[in-house]
Amino acid sequence: GLVGSEMCIRDRLQRDKRKPLLNRAIMGAYPPGSTFKTAQALTFLQEGIIHEDYPTFPCAHGFNYGSLHVGCHGHGSPLPLVPAIATSCNSYFCWGLFRMFSDKKYGSPQNAITVWKDHMVSQGFGYRLGTDLPGEQRGLIPNAKFYDKAYRGSWNGLTVISIAIGQGEILATPLQIANLGATIANRGHFITPHVVK
């Protein structure tokens, strides 16, 4: 066990407001933001919502639908998938999610989000990755039940549009985001992250 000065050091570290003992890579869950857009793109491609070259979606400094506006920076418009990823276009991914949640093949936004969540889970989000380090968090990928409770059953793709760009209720650990990048680099091959000794 710890004795004397070691206990003092431990106690000081535990009281430190900067939390130096918190392993943020696995214990911190944060909105992933634009790093999440590649997961969205893979989902939209697999579901046939988009293809590499079409459709192109407009971006007039953001996604605009009625009075709803999700901002974006200035770049060319309209865009297909690859330039949308390259410019991190918020509008493109909002339109993709809106199309998916409005698609009649799912029957309802509740069914669409169930399919969407299954894709996110298959890409390593919403559950622990199974690393050999203690304290790994699972993050949060909301499901229909989550939104039915939050909005009393009255929601649609526009209500939850911020999840299209990794905002809103989405939470991921830095390790989950790094794992998504590694899985893409490995051409879809998922490897459980572990510590190399």
Segments and roles (model prediction):
Residues 5-6, 10-35, 39-197:
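Beta-lactam-recognizing serine transpeptidase/beta-lactamase-like catalytic domain environment
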